[in-house]
């Protein structure tokens, strides 16, 4: 855990980290010396020359004050390091997420990333003062006390030194017991978080299916798993605590027995033995403190583990190339491209090659799961091919830096996401520097102006989280306006009309067709009515382009596209007749 935390310390604070470690060690030495000085103090106080106790009292006072000062300075530096780690870590996590490969964002990893950002503040800031310092004391203070006892009684010093690995081993074993169960509990808590969020978001579907009781849903299973994991955690903590308790009692018996034997034989005086009892308590105190901090230590370990999992998540390696400025409409080319997701059963695309001419509109059609959306993702640079190249005007997309990849493409997703804010904010997110006239043109083309006209607050209407205040068709229109506002030479549309009614579908199709900006357009469609303006059609099946041509050419050929077209037209003519 400490190694993980040290790795998170910014480079410009490493010198302060070294200073913190040195001061913490000096503080431990001061406290150990102050503890052991009780022995000569008591011996002098009850000896033949009590006035000599003033000397030892002075040394004890000096050691105590030095310990206070060192602790105060160490705590201040520790808090500074905590805030530095917090700021550095949150920025690192935020910077890492945009370049992490999209297939990493499973439900579990998404919850991990959310917890890594949201739950790190108090733990990281207080980690040094509340956990690192006590943990360091538990390891160093008993050992330093044992070394300081050697000049007083080598027998006691050896016994105390022997007790250090015994007690640390018991602490380690106790933590190992708890850690195994805590890992399962942490996974169960993460799964429960995701299931509760899912349960809240899908209430409409659950109520329609009469499955609103948590016990009958995945939430019920997650709650049961979390309960089992919690009980296991408690069950594993108890044996660990008993083990440490036994080790502490054994260490106390050995030290007390050694002190008693040395006192009986006359090696130690009674006042020295009494003082050594206090030293024994101080010797065992750090171990007890750390055992009480075990839950907090495991919680912090889990937090650092979540941060580490995000910071080590696989990333897309972007190039360093830039995209030329200007309004040049590019050519898009796939050169023997293959792609597969990690852990997938096989390639999603295999041997895909085609060339899309500048300024044309190409429709990609095919059955569900054939790889249509993956082609768009590769053009946009959201994924990188496992084989082959994706070229834009002869430039490999993989060689472009992230900013260039973002500048080339404007994307309309099948399930658009609107940020919590106004309609204006969401449209301007594509190009914050756009003018009001450009904004007005984009919302008019996407027919968002009709929506704005009937809303009391117009373009300043709050859309809610993920656009929840708008209907599905309205959200899609806003996303179309956002895509049209961006001055990108490539426009990618991923099944933008698949879940829309006829009116909204017509509005979206007309908006894309009326866009006056010269672009190379690629439209993925499942409903063929939305591709009537396409210059070219690629029919994809099982990860390969099986047909390529214009709509009329493919219909005349009588192949897969023709069959697809005929099936949809027949479905559109279905009617329910009343008898």
Swiss-Prot record:
The record ties this protein, via SMART domains, to:
AAA
Q: Where are the membrane-spanning stretches?
A: 17-37, 53-73, 116-136, 159-179, 238-258, 261-281
Q: Which residues are on the Cytoplasmic side of the membrane?
A: 1-16, 74-115, 180-237, 282-579
**Is Magnesium among the key words of this record?**
no
The record's subcellular location field reads: Cell inner membrane
Query: In the UniProt record, does the keyword Cytoplasm occur?
Result: no
- Stored InterPro entries: AAA+_ATPase (IPR003593), ABC1_TM_dom (IPR011527), ABC1_TM_sf (IPR036640), ABC_transporter-like_ATP-bd (IPR003439), ABC_transporter-like_CS (IPR017871), P-loop_NTPase (IPR027417), Type_1_exporter (IPR039421)
Query: What effect does gene inactivation have here?
Result: Mutants show normal growth in iron-sufficient conditions, but show a growth defect under iron-deficient conditions.
Q: Which SUPFAM superfamilies match?
A: ABC transporter transmembrane region (SSF90123), P-loop containing nucleoside triphosphate hydrolases (SSF52540)
Give the E.C. number(s): 7.2.2.-
User: What enzyme category does the UniProt record give?
Assistant: translocase
Q: Which residues lie on this side of the membrane: Periplasmic?
A: 38-52, 137-158, 259-260
One GO biological process this protein is involved in is: siderophore-dependent iron import into cell
- What family is it from? Belongs to the ABC transporter superfamily. Siderophore-Fe(3+) uptake transporter (SIUT) (TC 3.A.1.21) family.
Cite the domain annotation text.
Answer: In IrtB the ATP-binding domain (NBD) and the transmembrane domain (TMD) are fused.
Assembly, in brief, is:
Forms a heterodimer with IrtA.
This chain's protein is named Mycobactin import ATP-binding/permease protein IrtB
Gene transcribed to yield this protein = irtB
């Amino acid at each position: 855990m400490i190694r993980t935390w040290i790795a998170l310390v910014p480079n410009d604070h490493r010198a302060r980290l070294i200073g913190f470690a040195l001061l913490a060690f000096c503080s431990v030495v001061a406290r150990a010396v102050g503890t052991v000085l009780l022995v000569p103090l008591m011996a002098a106080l009850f000896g033949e020359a009590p006035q000599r106790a003033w000397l030892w009292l002075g040394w004890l006072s000096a050691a105590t004050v030095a310990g206070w000062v060192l602790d105060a300075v160490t705590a201040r530096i520790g808090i500074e390091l905590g805030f530095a780690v917090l700021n550095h870590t949150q920025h690192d996590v935020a910077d890492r997420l945009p370049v992490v490969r999209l297939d990493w964002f499973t439900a579990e990893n998404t919850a991990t990333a959310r917890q890594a950002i949201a739950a790190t503040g108090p733990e990281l800031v207080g980690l040094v003062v509340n956990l690192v310092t006590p943990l360091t004391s538990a390891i160093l203070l008993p050992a330093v006390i044992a070394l300081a006892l050697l000049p007083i009684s080598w027998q006691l010093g050896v016994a105390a030194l022997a007790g250090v690995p015994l007690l640390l081993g018991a602490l380690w074993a106790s933590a190992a017991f708890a850690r195994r169960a805590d890992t399962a509990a942490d996974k169960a808590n993460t799964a429960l978080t995701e299931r509760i969020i899912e349960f809240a978001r899908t209430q409409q579907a659950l109520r329609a299916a009469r499955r609103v009781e948590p016990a009958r849903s995945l939430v019920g299973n997650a709650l049961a798993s979390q309960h089992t994991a919690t009980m296991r955690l408690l069950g594993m903590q108890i044996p660990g605590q008993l083990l440490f308790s036994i080790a502490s009692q054994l260490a106390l018996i050995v030290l007390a027995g050694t002190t008693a034997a040395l006192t009986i034989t006359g090696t130690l005086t009674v006042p020295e033995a009494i003082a050594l009892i206090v030293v024994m308590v101080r010797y065992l105190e750090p171990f007890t403190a750390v055992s009480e901090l075990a839950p907090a230590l495991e919680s912090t370990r889990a937090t650092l583990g979540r941060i580490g999992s995000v910071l080590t998540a696989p990333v897309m390696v972007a190039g360093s190339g830039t995209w030329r400025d200007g309004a040049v409409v590019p050519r898009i080319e796939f050169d023997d491209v293959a792609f597969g997701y990690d852990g997938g059963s096989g390639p999603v695309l295999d041997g895909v090659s085609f060339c899309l001419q500048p300024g044309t509109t190409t429709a990609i059609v095919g059955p569900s799961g054939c790889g249509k959306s993956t082609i768009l993702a590769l053009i946009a640079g959201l994924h990188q091919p496992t084989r082959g190249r994706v070229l834009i005007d002869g430039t490999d997309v993989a060689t472009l830096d992230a900013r260039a990849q973002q500048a080339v493409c404007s994307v309309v997703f099948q399930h658009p996401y609107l940020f919590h804010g106004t309609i204006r904010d969401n449209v301007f997110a594509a190009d914050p520097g756009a003018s009001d006239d450009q904004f007005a043109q984009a919302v008019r083309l996407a027919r968002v102006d009709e929506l704005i006209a009937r809303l009391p607050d117009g373009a300043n209407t709050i859309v809610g989280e993920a656009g929840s205040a708008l209907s599905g068709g309205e959200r899609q229109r806003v996303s179309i306006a956002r895509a049209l506002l961006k001055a990108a030479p490539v426009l990618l549309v991923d099944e933008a009309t698949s879940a829309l009614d006829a009116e909204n579908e017509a509005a979206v199709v007309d908006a894309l067709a009326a866009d006056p900006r010269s672009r190379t357009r690629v439209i993925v469609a499942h409903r063929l009515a939305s591709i009537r303006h396409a210059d070219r059609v690629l029919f994809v099946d099982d990860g390969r382009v099986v047909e390529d041509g214009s709509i009329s050419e493919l219909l005349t050929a009588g192949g897969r596209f023709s069959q697809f077209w005929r099936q949809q037209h027949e479905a559109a003519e279905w009617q329910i007749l009343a008898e």
